[in-house]
Amino acid sequence: MAAAQRRPLRFGWLSPCIGNRWSDHKPIVVEQAKYILPTVNDHFDSMWVADHFWGFDAKTDPFVEAWTSLTWLAAKFPDVQLCHHVLGQGYRPPALTAKMAATLQVFSENRFMLGIGAGWRGDEYTAYGYEFPSPSVRYAQLEEVVTICRLMWTEDDPSF
């Protein structure tokens, strides 16, 4: 590929949303945003936040909520793209997801990109009282969420 056709390499930062005993059980993202990210801010094009209810080692690990975290990061770092890594479609009703995404897009001045998936952590679904359907049903639900989001973002009077 010719140099003129190449896109510049871009870097994203995946937020460590979990806390641990070394962080005094506070989410590590808070410390990194305070001390580390300001010194390297010019080197990252995007920031990504995972959408889970708890960590992978124990349900008692502190884990920050993804939408609130991205909104906080949008306010602290006004020059980077923002995305979930990856939003679980089954955790929220589709119309609410579309509204939350549209709101963050406005507040961030068009720096938000909706990263969404079918969901895979059955333990999180059941712990919060959500149904955890088969993969084929979750993929069909994902398709519906994307359709509903697009309709709500582009139509004056959407219907599904």
Where do the PLM segments sit?
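Internal, glycine-rich beta/alpha segment that forms the wall or movable "lid"
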Residues: 2-7, 93-160
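Active-site beta-loop-alpha junctions enriched in small/polar residues
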Residues: 16-18, 52, 87-89, 117-119
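Alpha-helix-loop-beta-strand connector modules within alpha/beta enzyme cores
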Residues: 60-84, 141-152
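Residue-level signal for the nucleotide or nucleotide-sugar donor/cofactor binding architecture
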Residues: 61-64, 91-92, 137
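Short linear capping/connector segments at secondary-structure termini
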Residues: 50-55, 85-88, 129
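Hydrophobic faces of well-ordered beta-strands that scaffold small-molecule active sites
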Residues: 11-15, 47-49, 81-84, 112-116
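N-terminal beta1-alpha1-beta2 module of alpha/beta enzyme domains
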Residues: 1-76
